Amino acid sequence: MSKRTPAVFFFVALAFMAFGAAAAFSQQPVLTPQNSNTNQLLIAVSPVDENVVWAVGTGSVFVVTTDGGNTWRTGVVPTLNAGDVQLRDVQGVSDEVAYVLSIGNLTGDFAIYKTTDGGTTWTQQFQNQLIGAFYDCFAFWTPTNGIAHSDSVNGVFPDLITTDGMTWQSIANNMPPALSGEASFSSSGTCVATQGSGNAWIATGGSSIARILATTDGGNTWAAYDTPLASGPIAGGFSVAFRDATNGILGGGSLTTGTAVDQAQAATSHDGGQTWQLTNNPPVAYAIFCVSYLSNTTGVGGGGQHDGRSQAKRSPTDYTRYAVITADIGGAAWTPDEGTTWYALSGVTGYWAVAFANPQNGWMVGTNGTILKVSFP
């Protein structure tokens, strides 16, 4: 990404277990399909609040709503080769301001764009010139301070930082040395998570060890920590989220052909990413593409690993340790306790990404433009 008589204790334990299971089941979310007005695959989603949400996908397409998803407006970012370019990550800042990250077959297809007028026009802020670079994801601490992460090139991560929301500078010299073949996965735009004023975590795979790269000072210095997730050319950590500076969850696994449940893996950390422990097996049949807490305290805007600025309505339920995972064709699930127990979302399949503004307002996006609103009681 473990007195009273024994008989009395056993039955009391069973009673508490049954109550806990019933209570958790009663918290099953309400799932509401929404019409995105596109048939393109949607890969990443970023709620700003309960009303404003941005999502992006193939064909350089973006969609945005300002009414909580009742209506969605579609558009195309004018990328270098729009038909062949995919938008793999998005950071919503407001109904007018958003950033997107593009990838493609050409070196220059990897780029960052920004709009300040709701998607009417877009400005290219960065265009890749490094052969072999593959920018998987980005995340922001503030509306103008963010980090973009790439697969390694010749043992170096050519990562980028912006401190003004306009220009991007290399921090390759700050990054820890890469393992042979070390890379990340652009499955949902959540391979990097930000928190507070300078904390960030990057999930990797592709090599002999799946690692977390971590910084506490905005990318000036980094440490690398091993995780127990499987790793290999198509295996590792895909998605990472932190609910505060200490507690986080990591999702991933293997993309090998088949439907074995053990292809999906999740792990948690309670020391800022230094050590990780596998959770119980998630009930999905494919590598976890995305993991998101219901109440985020990281970054700017909602968007998976970014901070929802709106407040959830008052609820007797403590959602602190709740998280939702998506696994494309393998299904989706949620946990109320960071992976000790899991509940499958029956019939939910084909979704790549999930993100929450608050527990009552979350969105999944995926194949054929599908959007599903996720609302916990």
What do the PLM-derived regions correspond to, one by one?
Residues 2-10:
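Bacterial N-terminal signal peptides that target proteins for export
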Residues 1-2, 15, 311:
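Generic N-terminal leader/processing signal
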Residues 10-20:
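Bacterial N-terminal signal peptides
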Residues 25-377:
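Residue-level hotspots at or immediately adjacent to binding/recognition sites across diverse folds
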